[in-house]
């Protein structure tokens, strides 16, 4: 997803947000967020009027950077407040902003309402209760992945009837939603088409598994108030600021003259400012013009970038703009391409040490996920939802959350029954879904400048301006000499047709052209990998943008639920933060709140629940998958364990006992006359069905059971000698959901350890 250390300056669009100037408030936010303890103590001191005003203003800036209006209520807040407070909400807004700032000051532990009440006057307790409840429910506070935020309800949470939710996709949006829903007390299962979590956030390991390489979303863009920064802080993962220096090189290896570079940078940003004025002048007519066409008209009108070298440098900046938007400038809407700039998060752009997969796996912890379950059909109606995956397996639940990428929705590879509303289909069609590809390389050593994180290369041909135009160095965070070449714009589309060996040869030619004249030998990489995101049927592209004819409203339409049964999340449903990793995560938190509200509303209306344990059971499918390849079998007993190596004798596991269940007792058999058998043929058929009982056992206990002579003895030893309680489907899921997830992860880990798999080039 989109990121760049040399992101195009787009300040012309920030006039509506003049009260927030990133360059002026970054230091203040850093000071506030970086010293939680001293700030809390200061709240308890007697502050002067000026000090309190200063603190209130800083907290308002934090709220603003989180997407809250600085002096207004969110639409969802107004109905929660008494009419007099809603009419004059200043006190509530100050309290709300204080809660947001307090949470962000130290997000490693939950922020209970009682702690907030200790820092404000008692007369505001009611406002604290409303604001704290709203912010926690909406996922603005008290979310995360540390031990303090497990994927289960808090011990003091109220008991509620648990609705069931199927989540399509284990990317950042799906995992964030699933984790939040589990904390709300709902029943959740995630269906993921890949054999791994993360979706378009994909950290692989090259060079003998030593170096972490980002093939998908890579940079945390704007660390201030970024929820990904919250997760990193909770996990204690260090962040590396992407340094600003980004030298440019000609295609023959010469360094671009600094004066020329600065001149064209100014020209580029001036063209963008004039493009903003052009659309204001054209008004409605701008809706049908592309950003590329507008910039080219302006370039010719002002007669800038006329020489070959000037044009090549300007093209580099245009390629960088195409990278930021994952789309060709000829497709981007002049009228709306930068509609999200006013929400852009402040602060440095950062790399995460060890790769973004660390965040993904932390989000996965405790969340039940079934992998290699490609969704083909989603049926939704008054009775609930039914999802069919490739191979015909069916899952049913009360509600479903679809986090499929926009590219998948565009491809119509998922059938919706009934069809999605026409306005949603039209929004899917209008929005753009572009492409960014990469060539990732691990070298024996770092031969480039270790004091920079990025450098760029110009191209002669305009159609190829995005081919290997920017290089990212990950040697500071990856554990190896990792260099990644980016391919954007038209070049990204053509790149999908290029043989990986040819692509690697071109990249090495560029690097040798840059460093050879400096006397530096460019070694062959130890290992390399080329992405093919456009050819990947599980995403069909990289991230969204606003195409000609579209607008930010289409993001909102894509986020709309269907009859409170079918919900949608993902970066392409987040109008404020599209095309970003944090936008995906925030959309998942948003939908978790909507699903909880829909669930509670349905219960309050005396709705007949369509629970997980009814009909085709969700948990039945989960357990069937676990026992497809049992670790041990004997008679009617099967065993699966959470160990990774067989030496872990105390590793917990599950035993499954297969039994026959006559559903019609002999005393209830239907008496018939004549020569017919005294047996109901339907009952005879049902009598042949089986059911399962489950028990938690260790590997050591399972070995003891296997030594018994028969199944009857095993049951006696299990229940009497070992004192183990047998459970049905529902109890097993309620009691053992975390163990089920652990066994599933262990099974996948053991498969990986059975032998190294060949690394395929591409995705």
Swiss-Prot record:
The keyword Ion transport does not apply. Belongs to the flavin monoamine oxidase family. GO terms for biological process: chromatin organization; spermine catabolic process; thermospermine catabolic process. This is Lysine-specific histone demethylase 1 homolog 2. FAD binds at residues 192, 194, 200, 571. Its EC number is 1.-.-.-. Its cofactor is FAD. Probable histone demethylase. SUPFAM superfamilies: FAD-linked reductases, C-terminal domain, FAD/NAD(P)-binding domain, Homeodomain-like. Keywords: Chromatin regulator, FAD, Flavoprotein, Oxidoreductase. It is an enzyme of class 1 (oxidoreductase). Transmembrane segments: none annotated. One of its GO terms (molecular function) is spermine oxidase activity. Residues 53-152 form the SWIRM domain.
């Amino acid at each position: 997803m989109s990121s760049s250390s040399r992101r195009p300056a787009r300040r012309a669009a920030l006039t509506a947000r003049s009260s927030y100037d990133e360059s002026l408030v970054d230091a203040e936010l850093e000071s506030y967020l970086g010293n939680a303890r001293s700030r809390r103590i200061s709240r308890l001191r007697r502050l002067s009027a000026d000090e309190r005003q200063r603190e209130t203003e800083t907290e308002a800036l934090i709220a603003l950077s989180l997407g809250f209006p600085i002096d207004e209520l969110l639409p969802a807040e107004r109905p929660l407040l008494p009419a007099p407070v809603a009419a004059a909400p200043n006190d509530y807004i100050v309290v709300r902003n204080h809660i947001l700032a307090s949470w962000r000051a130290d997000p490693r532990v939950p922020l209970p309402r009682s702690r907030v009440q200790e820092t404000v006057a008692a007369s505001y307790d009611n406002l604290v209760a409303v604001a704290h409840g709203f912010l926690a429910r909406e996922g603005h506070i008290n979310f995360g992945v540390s031990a303090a935020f497990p994927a289960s309800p808090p011990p003091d949470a109220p008991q509620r009837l648990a609705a069931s939710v199927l989540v399509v996709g284990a990317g950042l949006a799906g995992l964030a939603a699933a984790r939040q829903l589990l904390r709300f007390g709902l029943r959740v299962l995630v269906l993921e088409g890949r054999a791994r979590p993360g979706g378009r956030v994909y950290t692989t390991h090259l060079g003998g598994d030593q170096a972490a390489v980002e093939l998908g979303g890579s940079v945390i863009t704007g660390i201030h108030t970024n929820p990904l920064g919250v997760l990193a802080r909770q996990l204690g993962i260090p962040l590396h600021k992407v340094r600003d220096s980004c030298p440019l090189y000609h295609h023959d290896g010469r360094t671009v003259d600094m004066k020329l570079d600065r001149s064209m940078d100014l020209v580029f940003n001036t063209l963008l400012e004039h493009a903003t004025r052009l659309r204001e002048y054209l008004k409605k007519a701008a809706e049908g013009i592309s950003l590329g066409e507008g910039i080219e008209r302006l370039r010719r009108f002002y007669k800038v970038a006329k020489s070959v070298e000037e044009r090549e440098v300007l093209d580099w900046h245009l390629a960088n703009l195409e990278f930021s938007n994952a789309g060709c400038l000829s497709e981007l809407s002049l009228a709306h391409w930068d509609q999200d700039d006013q929400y852009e998060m402040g602060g440095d752009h950062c790399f995460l040490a060890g790769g973004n997969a660390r965040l993904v796996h932390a989000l996965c912890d405790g969340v039940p996920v079934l992998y290699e379950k490609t969704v083909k059909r989603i049926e939704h109606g008054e009775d609930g939802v039914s999802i069919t995956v490739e191979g015909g397996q069916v899952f049913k639940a009360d509600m479903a959350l679809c986090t499929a990428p926009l590219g998948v929705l565009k491809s119509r590879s998922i059938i919706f029954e009934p069809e999605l509303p026409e306005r949603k289909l039209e929004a899917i069609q209008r929005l753009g879904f572009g492409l960014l590809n990469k060539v990732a390389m691990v070298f024996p050593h770092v031969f480039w400048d270790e004091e920079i994180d990025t450098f760029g290369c110009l191209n002669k041909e305009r159609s190829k301006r995005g081919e290997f135009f920017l290089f990212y160095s990950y040697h500071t965070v990856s554990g190896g000499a990792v260099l990644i070449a980016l391919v954007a714009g038209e070049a990204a589309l053509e790149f999908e047709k290029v043989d990986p060996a040819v692509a690697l040869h071109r990249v090495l030619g560029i690097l040798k052209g840059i460093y050879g004249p400096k006397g530096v030998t460019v070694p062959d990489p130890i290992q390399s990998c080329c992405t093919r995101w456009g050819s990947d049927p599980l995403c069909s592209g990289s991230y969204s943008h606003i195409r000609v004819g579209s607008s930010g409203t289409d993001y909102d339409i894509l986020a709309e639920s269907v009859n409170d049964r079918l919900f949608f999340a993902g970066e392409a449903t987040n109008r404020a933060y599209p095309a970003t990793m944090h936008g995906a995560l925030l959309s998942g938190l948003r939908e978790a709140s909507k699903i909880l509200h829909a669930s509670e509303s349905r219960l309050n209306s005396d709705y007949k629940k369509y629970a997980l344990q009814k009909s085709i059971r969700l948990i039945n499918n989960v357990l069937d998958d676990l026992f497809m390849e049992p670790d041990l079998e004997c008679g009617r007993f099967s065993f699966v364990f959470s160990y990774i190596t067989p030496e872990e004798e105390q590793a917990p596991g599950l035993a499954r006992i297969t039994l026959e269940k006559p559903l019609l007792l002999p005393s209830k058999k239907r008496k018939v006359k004549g020569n017919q058998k005294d047996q109901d043929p339907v009952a005879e058929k049902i009598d042949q069905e089986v059911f399962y009982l489950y028990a938690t056992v260790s590997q050591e206990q399972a070995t003891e059971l296997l030594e018994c002579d028969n199944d009857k003895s095993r049951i006696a030893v299990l229940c009497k000698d070992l004192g183990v309680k047998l459970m049905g489907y529902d109890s097993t899921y309620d009691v053992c959901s975390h163990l089920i997830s652990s066994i599933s992860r262990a099974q996948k880990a053991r498969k990986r350890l059975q032998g190294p798999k060949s690394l395929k080039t591409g995705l």
